[in-house]
Amino acid sequence: MPAVPIVKDQNIPHTIPFFSVIVAVYNDWLALDGCLQSLAQQTDGPSFEMVVVDDGSREQAPETVAKWNRIFPISVVRQEHAGISIARNKGIQTSTGSVLVFVDADCRMQQGCLAALKQKISGAPAENCFQLRLIGNPADLVGRAEQLRLIALQRHLLQPNGRIRYLNTAGFAIRRSKVSEDGNLFNPIAVRAEDTLLLATLVRLGELPIFVPEAVVQHHICLSLAGCLRKDVRSAYFERRAFDIIEARGVAIQMTNQDRWAIMSSMWRATDQAALGKLPWFVVTGRQALRLLVSTGYRILH
C-alpha cells in the first residue's frame, strides 16, 4: 500500500528535502518514539523527511506518531511482513530526499547529527557512502557493553584515509544517485546482515564508506542481557545466508582471528579509557563467542 502522511500540516513546506531518514519497524513502536524525539532536535539543521516502514507489525502505528508531522514531514507505509531488506527498499521507493539516511528504531540521533552529516557530504561531492559514528547508552550494563564494542570496532576498522571497513545501517547514509532507479539497494535474500552484504558490494567496487565521527547516533538497546543473548542466537543463524552469498562472490569481509584478538585487546584497554569497568568486556566477548559458536554450528550442519 502507498505511503500516506499520517497528518498533513500546511505549515510544512512540501519541497524536496536534503535527507530522507528511513526507519523499518517491526513491533518496535515504543523504541521508535525515542528515535522520533531525537529527530525533532534536528529541525534547525538541513531539511529532511522521515519515512517509517511498518514491516507487518502486530499493531499499526500508534496515534502518538501522528503528532510528529507537525514538527517534521513523516510518512508511514505498511507492508506484509517481508523482512528488513525489503522494508528498507520500500522506504527508498517511498522517499524523495537527495540523500538516504538509514537508522534503526532503537537509535537516537545526537544533537547536530544531520548538520554534521550534511557538512561532510557537501565537502565531499565525489563520495557517495557515509558511515555515521555509533555509540552505546552507558546507563546500564548492556548499554556499556555496546558502547565498548562500538568504540573498539570503529577504531580498529577506521583507515588512515578516513574510510572505514564497516557499514551499519543503524547510522548509514548514501546518495540517491548511487541507488538503482528501482530502489532495491538491499538484497531481499538477506534476512539479517543485509548491511554487511551491502558492504561486500562496496568493497568489490572499491568504495568504502567515509567515516563521519561528528555525526553521532546512539544505539539505545531496550533488551535485557538474556534477551540480547536470545537475539544473538537468532541473528547468527540467519546471518549465515548473507555470509554464504559474500563468500560465493569471493569477497573477504569477515573478521579473521587476528582481527578478533586485536579488537578484544583494544576493548580491554578502552574499559579504562572510557571508564566503563571490566564487566562489559566479559559481556561483549561472551556474546561474540556465542554468535561464533552458532555460526560454526550452522556451517557444520549445512
Q: Can you name each region flagged by the protein language model?
A:
Residues 191-200:
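Acidic donor-binding loop at a coil-to-helix junction in glycosyltransferase catalytic cores
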Residues 100:
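Short aromatic/hydrophobic "clamp" motif used to bind/position activated sugar donors
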Residues 231-237, 251-302:
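Non-catalytic, C-terminal membrane-associated alpha-helical segments of glycosyltransferases
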Residues 5, 28-41:
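Short, well-formed alpha-helical segments that are part of the catalytic scaffolds
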Residues 112-143:
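Conserved donor NDP-sugar-binding/catalytic core segment of glycosyltransferases
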Residues 132-133, 146-165:
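Short, flexible, basic/aromatic active-site loop/helix in glycosyltransferases
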Residues 79-95:
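Glycine-rich, basic loop-to-helix element that forms the pyrophosphate-binding segment
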